[in-house]
Each structure stands twice: as C-alpha cells, then as structure tokens.
C-alpha cells in the first residue's frame, strides 16, 4: 500500500467506450480449484461442472452474452444502494432510452424500504439518488452500474445514508483545499457454501498454521485466486480505481486496494468494488464475508486499513502535519472505534498485527499500532499515515469523512493537546 498514496490520483471517473472484448470472457476464468477435502464436496462440485455443460444452461448463457448495441440504443442501468444493515448491498435494473455519461442525466427511482429494513410498511417508499456511474462488466456494452444514496420522499437522507453526511464534510472549503487522498485496503474471506467454512479448509478442521499463505503461490497455499483475479479485471473494466490485490495471512482470505482516490470518490469506488465482488462470488457459488474475525483462535482477522494524506502532509514539512493529525486522532480514539465496524472488538486484541481496541498508539513501521507511519514518510519528512483500526465491514463513507473531520475541522483544547502530546511523546 506504500505505493498507493505516492502516485497522482485520478480525481474524476470519465466513462469511455468499453472494450470490444466481450465481458463474458472474464467469467470463463472463474473456476474454483478447491482442494479435495471430502468426497461429498468433490462430488458436489463435479455435478455443478457437469450441469454447466447442459444444453439448457448453454442457451441461457448465450442470451446473457447477447450484444444489444447493434439493435437498440437502449441500455440497462443497475441501481445499487446500501440496505438496512448498513453493510448489505441491494440492486435492481431499469431500461434507459440512450447511453448516459453523468449521474445528473439519470432519473431518481424508488424502492420498497419496508423490505430492506429502511422504512415502515405504511410509508415504505425510499428514493434513490444516482451519485456515481461505472461500466457494467457483467452486461458489457453501454450498460452501467449506478451507485445511489437513499432519501425520504421529502428529500431527507434516511438514517442508513452515510454518504450524504460524508459529502457535506468533503464539500467543506477547508477540507476541499487540502485535497484528501485515501487508499483503502479491503480484506475479505471466502467461505465454502452451506458449511460457512473458509475456502480450501478441510470442513470442521484446520489447515497448517499461518506463515506460508500471505502472498503465497501453489495449490496448498492459495485458495480463491481465480475469484480475486476475476474481481480485479472486473474493477478495471468498470472504471474503479483499484490499485492491487494479494492473498492474506489467513488462508482463504484476500485483499484488494482502492486508491488513491480523492474525497467522496473513495467511498463510491469501494462500495462498487464490493458490489462486483458480491456478484462474482454469487456466480462462483462461494460465500463472501466481511466479518472482522471470521475464525476464532490463532488466525488473523480481516481489516480495512485506510491510508490517508492531505496536501499539507504531502508537501515539505508534512511529517509535522502528520504528527498533529495523529494527536487529534488519539483524542477522538473511542469515537472513531465506535464508527469503524461491528465486531471489531474481536479483531483489535493487540495480537495478529493489531493494536488493542482500548488503547491508542502510533509508530513507524509498526503494524501493532493504531496508526502506522511508513519509513519512507519518516525519511522524506512527508507522506501519509495508515489507520489500521477500521474493520473489514466498515463503511468507507464514514471512515474517510471522519478522518477528514478529525484532522482538518476538529480542534482540541490546548490543555488536551498538551496532555496527549506528552502521553504519545509527540512534539507538535
């Protein structure tokens, strides 16, 4: 992730003409190479493979792969929004009369909020406001994915709409002038269906201890690479600012990185990337979880480390600005923790490359701290910081806007600042 915040970011996503290569070719690579853990599992997977050769299935696939562009200007727009739990994704499709390139060209829409836990049955209508457009790698052509946020019919953001508040913070003049960059490291775990046990693990048992799996290569060390690669290509096709992927410390766990992205775009891109991953695992017959500690015991949890910098941090003398930001973050530690994802107390134990949830800490190149500063940043005297506290199920709208608010808009008292500086051995 050190490279993510060193490059110039692409601030605005522009729709370009999609590749002529049919997007369906991408999914031909989604083949699960599961280790033979039990005869029943192997038989189940082989039956699935045989069914895919069925002539009926093939006819359905041929229809899915139809290119409609030669016959109509109409396109399909998939409207995507966050559901009632604050982490679940919902979507539905509509036909548009012609291709569009900007969210302002799209109509608002509505859905039944009583079926998503976001509105009562007697007044169930929730309004979708289109906010960001991405190319659709599943349908190809001029078809699009639309990230939306959610409002009452009167135009008020509903409680689960965290994007609206984030947009307010990022539109603040002081925040806007600092051009905040975010690089987000999304970890996730792939599970075998029906048993909800990590992909590649023997059902009800465990593989060898952690060590060989991080960025590992080989059938005995890497399970789920096809899904990770398919997701990577789908994100690139869609126009998501994805910057890399890797296998994680716990087998069956993977990570992708988004960024550097500016302001509200970071949240839009992460949520769309999550949507693509949900769809790909759906097609592959694999369960996706963002649980921050999917397996108890001596196994790493899943986080969503967030790398952050401002214009002042990236300029000469920026390390002093970073230290002031760390001081502010220390004083609002518990406020950030409460907003950084559910179940995070099971992950932030002080073990497995985490800091204790109850104690704020920072360090250079120390992955056991709340906030890590890279050695390059220390050496150059400018750069970025990494907030290692967010859980894998965090809302990127909340985390990114809270980082900006705490470091750019919130001012502690001089007394509190002095005490925190002394406690953290910070000279600011």
Swiss-Prot record:
The light-modulated chloroplast enzyme, encoded by a nuclear gene and expressed primarily in leaves, is responsible for the reassimilation of the ammonia generated by photorespiration. It catalyses: L-glutamate + NH4(+) + ATP = L-glutamine + ADP + phosphate + H(+). Coiled coil: none annotated. The keyword Acyltransferase does not apply. GO terms for biological process: glutamine biosynthetic process. It comes from Brassica napus (Rape). Residues 75-155 form the GS beta-grasp domain. Residues 94-120 are annotated as: Disordered. Residues 1-49 form a transit peptide. SMART domains: Gln-synt_C. This is Glutamine synthetase, chloroplastic. One of its GO terms (molecular function) is glutamine synthetase activity. It is found in: Plastid, Chloroplast. Homooctamer. The gene is GLN2. The lineage of its organism: Eukaryota, Viridiplantae, Streptophyta, Embryophyta, Tracheophyta. It is an enzyme of class 6 (ligase). GO terms for cellular component: chloroplast. Its EC number is 6.3.1.2. InterPro entries: Gln_synt_N, Gln_synt_N_sf, Gln_synth/guanido_kin_cat_dom, Gln_synth_cat_dom, Gln_synth_gly_rich_site, Gln_synth_N_conserv_site, Glutamine_Synthetase. Belongs to the glutamine synthetase family. Keywords: ATP-binding, Chloroplast, Ligase, Nucleotide-binding, Phosphoprotein, Plastid, Transit peptide.
